[in-house]
UniProtKB/Swiss-Prot annotation:
It comes from Danio rerio (Zebrafish). Its EC number is 3.4.23.-. Residues 1-74, 308-346 are annotated as: Disordered. Residues 45-60 have a biased composition (Low complexity). The lineage of its organism: Eukaryota, Metazoa, Chordata, Craniata, Vertebrata. The chain crosses the membrane at residues 86-106, 138-158, 166-186, 200-220, 226-246, 249-269, 356-376, 382-402. Belongs to the peptidase A22A family. The active site is at residues 262, 360. This is Presenilin-2. It is an enzyme of class 3 (hydrolase). Residues 1-85, 159-165, 221-225, 270-355, 403-406, 428-441 are cytoplasmic. Homodimer. Component of the gamma-secretase complex, a complex composed of a presenilin homodimer (PSEN1 or PSEN2), nicastrin, APH1 and PEN2. GO terms for biological process: amyloid-beta formation; axonal transport of mitochondrion; brain development; calcium ion homeostasis; melanocyte differentiation; membrane protein ectodomain proteolysis; neurogenesis; Notch signaling pathway. GO terms for molecular function: aspartic endopeptidase activity, intramembrane cleaving.
Length: 441
């Protein structure tokens, strides 16, 4: 296989949100879509071709492993990598939900109802009238979904007309608010809860360092683990804001509606998120790392300079961490390529990076946090937690079957809602009755 064939195959057969260098697409609700890497030659999800740094087209370690593996053992190889992808997603999702639940259980600020509401939920719920409360929750959901659809369309138009600087500025402003203002609120309430004395200059210095490092890691360059940690933290902070300011019934209806919208936006031929995916595939552009959690490094350096021919090679190198432009490199590019030398194993791991939208982290945590805040029972909270992980496993299973970008919310949120209401209305009364009569099963 020569260089041109390898490049043509990887361009024509790449999937949305697949590899670190492959384009994935931003969305307003931070793209509730996820995907696994797939083989660029055989379209199997088991192994991925690793291109050499010189662009010679030699087979990578996984290709050699597959070549030496009988057909009967390919399924075992696929399952091995599939299990690794499950673990790579379970750990960050679990950490995000644990942070939210621990905060809900310890900091009363996020469970107290102050009467304030988000601008997206203008209708007040009346607890004395079930019908009116249900109607207002549905109206709040319609307003919320309408805002999401409108902002997604704006994002599609901006991306279609290559307004990358505007999108990047939009994301930077959002990150600034989360990393500075919301973090300041969070630390202040935590210090009040645990009676930690701290003066404002010291607190501001902590917030400043925390926010600046986060902005650099998310929007420029930084260690992979640190970038992942910041993405988990901002997802947890956003989920806590939703838990505090969303009305109770509106929150449950919004969770169900956002799952349906996610299904339509990703899978419909004219869905906005699918259009974004297809546009990014055609342009061969990287994703905005502020919108997704990636198990492989994603950098956004020089994306706005799309007309510069040298920027394409630079994006290829920075997107995968080890990628260099295929073919003959100029003397100007050679020192830059030599600055980042990684082994083939690290290259393979970054190619096989799993990506999950931050919106999925947020709404998973909202569901578990609402269960912990309203139910107050650990059985209900753990049931929702297990339901979300089961739904995530099934989504990954479907991903391995269909080999294309899939919405990550519908299955997990549906299972979570079913487990919550069944546990809260059936299991908890049953357990309380057993405890009251001192029955042991």
């Amino acid at each position: 296989m020569n260089t041109s064939d390898s490049e043509e195959d990887s361009y024509n057969e790449r999937s949305a949100l697949v590899q670190s260098e492959s384009p994935t697409v931003p969305s307003y609700n931070q793209d509730n879509a996820m995907s696994l890497p797939q083989d660029t030659d055989s379209k199997r999800s088991g192994a991925v071709r690793s291109r050499s740094a010189s662009g010679s087209g030699d087979a990578g370690p996984v290709d050699r492993e597959r070549a030496d593996t009988p057909d009967g053992e390919e399924e075992e190889l696929t399952l091995k990598y599939g299990a690794k992808h499950v673990i790579m997603l379970f750990i960050p999702v679990t950490l995000c939900m644990v942070v939210v639940v621990a905060t809900i259980k310890s900091v009363s600020f996020y469970t107290e109802k102050s009467g304030q509401r988000l601008i997206y939920t203008p209708f007040e719920e009346d607890p004395n009238s079930v019908g009116q409360r249900l109607l207002n929750s549905v109206l709040n959901t319609l307003v919320m979904i309408s805002v999401i659809v409108f902002m997604t369309i704006i994002l599609v138009l901006l991306y279609k007309y290559r307004c990358y600087k505007f999108i990047h500025g939009w994301l930077i402003l959002s990150s600034l608010m989360l990393l500075f203002w919301f973090s300041f609120m969070y630390l202040g309430e935590v210090f009040k809860t645990y009676n930690v004395a701290m003066d404002y200059p010291t607190l501001l210095m902590i917030i400043w360092n925390f926010g600046v490092v986060g902005m650099i890691c998310i929007h420029w360059k930084g260690p992979l683990r640190l970038q992942q940690a910041y993405l988990i933290v901002i997802s947890a902070l956003m989920a806590l804001i939703f838990i505090k300011y969303l009305p109770e019934w509106s929150a449950w209806v919004i969770l169900g509606a956002i799952s349906i919208y996610d299904l339509i936006a990703v899978l419909c031929p004219k869905g906005p998120l699918r259009m974004l995916v297809e546009t990014a595939q055609e342009r061969n552009e990287p994703i905005f790392p502020a919108l997704i959690y990636s198990s492989a490094m994603v950098w956004m350096v020089g994306m706005a300079d799309s007309n510069n021919p040298d920027s394409a090679g630079e994006r290829r190198r920075s997107g995968g961490g080890v990628r260099t432009q295929e073919g003959v490199e100029s003397e100007h590019d050679a020192p830059q390529a030599g600055r980042r030398q990684y082994s083939a194993e690290e290259d393979l791991e970054e190619d096989r990076g799993v990506k999950l939208g931050l919106g999925d982290f947020i709404f998973y945590s909202v569901l578990v946090g609402k269960a912990a805040a309203t139910g107050g029972d650990w059985n209900t909270t753990l049931a929702c937690f297990v339901a979300i992980l089961i739904g995530l496993c099934l989504t990954l299973l479907l991903l391995a079957i269909f080999k294309k970008a899939l919405p990550a919310l519908p299955i997990s949120i549906t299972f979570g809602l079913v487990f919550y209401f069944s546990t809260d209305n059936l299991v908890r009364p049953f357990m309380d009755s057993l405890a009251a009569h001192q029955y042991y099963i």
